[in-house]
Curated annotation (Swiss-Prot):
SMART domains: Skp1 (SM00512). It comes from the Eukaryota. InterPro entries: ELC1, SKP1-like, SKP1/BTB/POZ_sf, Skp1_comp_POZ. The keyword Ubl conjugation applies. Keywords: Host-virus interaction, Nucleus, Transcription, Transcription regulation, Ubl conjugation, Ubl conjugation pathway. GO terms for molecular function: protein-macromolecule adaptor activity; transcription corepressor binding. It comes from Homo sapiens (Human). Overexpressed in prostate cancer cell line PC-3 and breast cancer cell line SK-BR-3. This is Elongin-C. The keyword Nucleus applies.
Amino acid sequence: MDGEEKTYGGCEGPDAMYVKLISSDGHEFIVKREHALTSGTIKAMLSGPGQFAENETNEVNFREIPSHVLSKVCMYFTYKVRYTNSSTEIPEFPIAPEIALELLMAANFLDC
């Protein structure tokens, strides 16, 4: 390998395959970058040329989104990627009534 060490995956560097989303209560969710880009807000934070520190670290802190909501958001990212342009029947995405309002506010903020 000519002294060059190539690393694929992980959360570090501009070509990282994963990003780290951190909830208001400190839980870390490592998700595929492609899935996180479902969110217009995260996409803007991770793609602008040096506008946001998140672009360099591939970490996004959400001071207003608790882990029980952010975990559901991450599930939705996977659901959205899986069923966008799918020819199969799309199952309903389950949402517990107890978190519906918080999830709606998070979805509005995240633009997803």
